[in-house]
Amino acid sequence: FDADLQALTAFYKKNGFIDVVIGPYEIQPLGEKHIEIVINVYEGTKYNFGGITIEGNEFFPSDELKDVFTMKIGEPFDQEVFDNELRNVYSKYFDEGFIYVFIVPNYVKEGDQLIVNLKINENNRARIRQIHITGNKRTKEKVIRRQLEISPGDYFRQTQVMRSQQNIYNLGFFEQDIRLDYTPINKDGDIDLQLDV
């Protein structure tokens, strides 16, 4: 039942009602075999998307980050779409080595318009210092290292790391759950990568 309440909340937020409050609810008997569930819903204002402002970004121009978002001004604000596209902004930063980026969306309500202000703290770019490979009992380490699309000294790039994991899996020696972890090693945010095959 809790999942149903969460789905109802998500439905409202997908349709512009970002302040929706679901509950409390009451269970009332209907005869001997049935019950009725009465759920109180406070919808709040239905907001339309009013645009995005961005501050704190230095690496990417604001227009490039805004292009990630597909909602059109005047459309009902869709929380699910916004959250997915915000994850895409994070991925964009991760792919350039900004694994410590922190983005805070602030919602500014002007009438029935919702303007989103993204406050970005990019922090330092992470360089890879060393790559450690563990769990290998099937082939020479150099065979695995040839599959890596990243090297010590490179900036961490999420897509290259994911392709490296796939390349290692494609060798056919290892299970698909090749795990990757990283350890910060200095105040600049540089990292050592740990690949467990």
Where are these regions (language model features)?
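Periplasmic polypeptide-binding modules associated with outer-membrane biogenesis and secretion
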Residues: F1-V197
